[in-house]
Amino acid sequence: LFHGAVERAFEPRTKRALWRVDMLYGRRYLLLLSEEIPNLSGIVEQFGTGEAPETRDYAPLLERIQQGSSWKFRLHANPTFSSINAKGSRGRVHACTLVGMPKAEEEKPGRKTQYGWIRSQAEKHGFAVDENDLNIARIQWYAFSKPTGERVRLLGVTYEGTLTITDAQAFC
């Protein structure tokens, strides 16, 4: 229901938008990130609190990102990995349900922890996480049905910590 309302805020759809519902200072917020200004009238009408939505230009923040800079972060993600099938191509997608284990164990085929997932994403996307400040703040399973009736279960993991930019272009 809520996902559909967010998607309709960007019609006609031209680019991908990232969003999440977050708790900040004891209040629930919808945080959106997109290259387009959304039409939030449907969301306000259906779920609004009476307060007008606010938008901010993201460019000034992006301009401050440079190699070696450090940032506090909170990321709510669906950490997954794909198994390889008998033909050697991508098989099933699995949730990273293991929280942690020694790195040597984690590197075995078919193993991926929630901490290992964020480390691998960091490497691909131009940042490193401070292992001493990395925390899994919340783990939650979500279940819903697709219009076809197929049941879907997703694992949501909230990561918090400090990241350091290693490649500003890849990060942005």
What are these regions (language model features)?
Residues 1-172:
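RNA-interacting cores
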